[in-house]
């Protein structure tokens, strides 16, 4: 066969001889053709399989192998280890498979372990083929298919990890069943039945030897009888290909990504599933409980004054504590958090046993940590079944590690309880009934997980109903993210108890209006934020990675006073040795709370007396929208909303055409700025007919027919609107809804990129109309402009504002009106005014650039950056003489001022109310 990149094998018609010009013939080195016509895809696939064994492939560095009978088509990409199978007539639809021929390599899904990706892709192909052959989509049929796939996954793992004899499942399947797949279902049904039969069950004595050789599995995995789906030749071959993978190299904790690869993408998007990498899982479980257990272990061993037998006693006590805890994931998906938590606890237990052994006690060590300590609720049936399977496999892995390290372990088979995994809607379940506690005061339960996210505009009707159920009794909750439901239910579960919680969430619940809605009622339950990871971009190993920014938040109940039998007050705690300790309540100090802040290299841990709902060091006070500014400054209002159906707005071309047709119209045309036009220098125009007299308006059809036509279209659009306010506006169809047009104003865009250090703002005059995509401060001063352009104000904005995706969504009521303004003398205000003008001068010196370009942090001109830095230093000094180290320190200072200002305002309001009440009493 020739080189050049192609290998060709004939399917039904037989391969050709050796080819030249870059083609390698099936006969000359590809293993020959299929020999005669007919046979369909099974023959083509067989020809391709034979071709892959040819020594000519390596010799000639061939990239693609192809086999076809001109009805069916199969190809193999050697470099990508990828297979294409399709009807010959559909070949053109699959051109992307051959893009490497044009120099475009196909992208590959990232995984830290390539075996995970390959297994996920092959399982996906197998699932697709089975679904195509079995069209029943009833809930019962889908559940049966889900059970079937998890049973296959178990068999693949079992034969590669020592549960079954090596390769026994795949070899039996390949050696006994027919190539056309007609008896594959019957084979699997018989095998699954045997796997559910105990060693002395009569069915084993009657079974064929190749079935009886398989051990009893138990654990419920094969207990129920479900129909096995129909197979054809291709499905059987895909099944065998899956079996030939090395499943020993695949981690059960990657099952989330594998699961994601085989379910419907639309369903995946609807469920909002964001599968979690192991490092991100550890962000939740380490500070939630692992760090405490590891510290206890280290402290026991570190004390050189403690006798060996005392250390052994304390190590046993710690191990017994591990055996008593419960881990509960109320949105467990395919079990990733539970699996990692289980494996980490088992690993710590192994280290405890090794330490006991090294201290001179050579016992027979058997694990006290069992799967029935792990609880999960998952709404998706397949994911729930996968979670059960994954926990069994994780148990087998840890039993093997236990055996390797300590020389003895309980056998994996028969399987034991797979934990408490419930396929149900977590938000409609009673968590207390599902994960019960004998004593809220003593039982350790750790709630952990990554619940689904869903903003107010991205929720299904069912999810909205979930929120109505979860937040029953709340006046406001619809603006909350869907994930907030889990925090609220979790907070109710852990209140007044030893239970703790750590959940991954979209960072929106720590921003904007959501903060007061969610966190005020949570804190009212006497719960605090015990630790938190500030915002970081989400990354996981699943296909089509979800583009979100997340936080990790840990919650715990405040220590509560409880009456002892003698009437004294005490607080309850666990000691380092795992025992229970009563401490004097008055002497108990709150443990420091840990705030994990991102740095260039890693995470920096800051200890704080309290973590605010904005995930900074500070009080629990939530900033709330207000209608007036906290300081004595100019008010901020929305720009002008047109509500015109687009008929009062003109492109540059439309503007020129209108002026050409009706030259007198030029006096009514003004420049129009939304946030995009403002930031990126784009041009739009509008008809601003505010000053039109009644006579001019009446004569428009004769004097300006094009403008009149536009006005009539506005009137029609407003009358058709379901909004009554818009219908009312039809009475003045020639005007925008809002009519703000001051002589001068400061424009503040409502949406700005998170990359910018400063939100770009500008002074504009009455010749420019701003839409409601911007805020405006009519007749704002240069001093106000200077404060707003400082880092002090921008750092405040970054913390308290909401987000549109990850961009800043500037709110006048939530950012501007709540901002604590400094006490500045007239001279200080004059200095800020001059520094603000310097910023405008620096912009003017770079007049060829848009504001988006000027405020790109990578391209900001030096003179503009220096002007801002000079302003920043001056504004900082208005707040205190000592320089601020960073933005967080500024915000912490501002929150302290905000708290004082709000308290003073409330005190003044109370005094006025009391004075009024006093006057009323005097009159009475």
Give, region by region, the residue ranges found by the protein language model.
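Conserved catalytic cores of phosphodiester-cleaving nucleases, focusing on short active-site segments
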Residues: 1-2, 33-53
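Long, low-complexity Q/N-rich tracts
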Residues: 2-34
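Signature of N6-adenine DNA methyltransferases within the class I
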Residues: 45-50, 59-65, 71-118, 139, ...
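Preference for the N-terminal adenyl/adenosyl cofactor-binding alpha/beta module
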Residues: 88-344, 373, 377-386, 390, ...
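Segments forming glycine/polar-rich beta-alpha architectures that bind adenosine-containing cofactors
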Residues: 238, 624-772, 889-924
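Proline-centric
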Residues: 289, 328-330, 377, 490-496, ...
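Non-catalytic DNA-recognition/assembly elements of restriction-modification systems
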Residues: 332, 706-717, 818-924
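Short, ligand-facing micro-motifs at secondary-structure edges
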Residues: 534, 753-768, 786, 795-808
